[in-house]
Amino acid sequence: MAVDPFDSALDLLRRLNPKQTTDHLNAIISIAPDLTEDLLSSVDQPLTVRRCKQTGRDYLLCDYNRDGDSYRSPWSNQFDPPLDEAGSGGVGAGGNEGAGEGAIPSERVRKMEVKANEAFDVYRDLYYEGGVSSVYFWNLDDGFAGVVLLKKSSPQGGNSEGVWDSIHVFEAIERGRSTHYKLTSTVILTLSTSGGNLGEMDLSGNMTRQVEQDLPVENDDSHIANVGRLVEDMELKMRNLLQEVYFGKAKDVVGDLRSIGSLSEGARDREAQRELIGSMRK
């Protein structure tokens, strides 16, 4: 039975350091260029920041606002570098539907996209106290879809560095006075620290979770509130899961493998503990 090259590429990426996902992905694409589009649309990469030439505001790049080497700014709705021709209403010049490939949202969906960017800009400032956020919407036959991007990097130059990238892709299927939302959220986290006593440590990884929910809708503004609530709840759950489960387990493993103090100090502490327990038993 023949092995699917696409599945093999994904399997390989899962086994490599997630901190270098972009480098590994580019290496695989150079070997198998026919997998380029499938891999770029399937593999979550750390987000890249670009400045909008029309507005001077930063925005985030991803596959959902990409057409070749051009990316659409959510602030100006323009591609950089400019495209020869771009479609409207979620349909690109080549007749494609959805995000990317020259597609821009319809007038109604674009208005929601603008409001969503304003709302998540406030959310980013409240929860992240900095960083960059971007929201992109596109049309579907029975509703619309979008992606909410958030990126925060710790200041460089200290003993510790960290980067948080969250990617929230959703579909909103409209059903009269209610809408069915399907949200897929991915967090890509990189943490590194170095010091005289501890040396260097690097923790990198990603986590993906999904949720589906039906919520009431009165008007287009309700969509912004509903998506905001879903993203906020999901980020809180994933952050708590990372902190309590994954980091807690990593702390236990590192503690078992490596002591902050010297081995002789650890041996003396264990001997003192044994003597104390022995005296209590007498």
Curated annotation (Swiss-Prot):
F-actin-capping proteins bind in a Ca(2+)-independent manner to the fast growing ends of actin filaments (barbed end) thereby blocking the exchange of subunits at these ends. Unlike other capping proteins (such as gelsolin and severin), these proteins do not sever actin filaments. Belongs to the F-actin-capping protein beta subunit family. It comes from the Eukaryota. Component of the F-actin capping complex, composed of a heterodimer of an alpha and a beta subunit. It comes from Gibberella zeae (strain ATCC MYA-4620 / CBS 123657 / FGSC 9075 / NRRL 31084 / PH-1) (Wheat head blight fungus). Its main location: cytoplasm. Pfam families: F_actin_cap_B. Residues 73-103 are annotated as: Disordered. Residues 87-101 have a biased composition (Gly residues). This is F-actin-capping protein subunit beta. GO terms for cellular component: actin cortical patch; F-actin capping protein complex. Coiled coil: none annotated. The keyword Protein biosynthesis does not apply. Keywords: Actin capping, Actin-binding, Cytoplasm, Cytoskeleton.
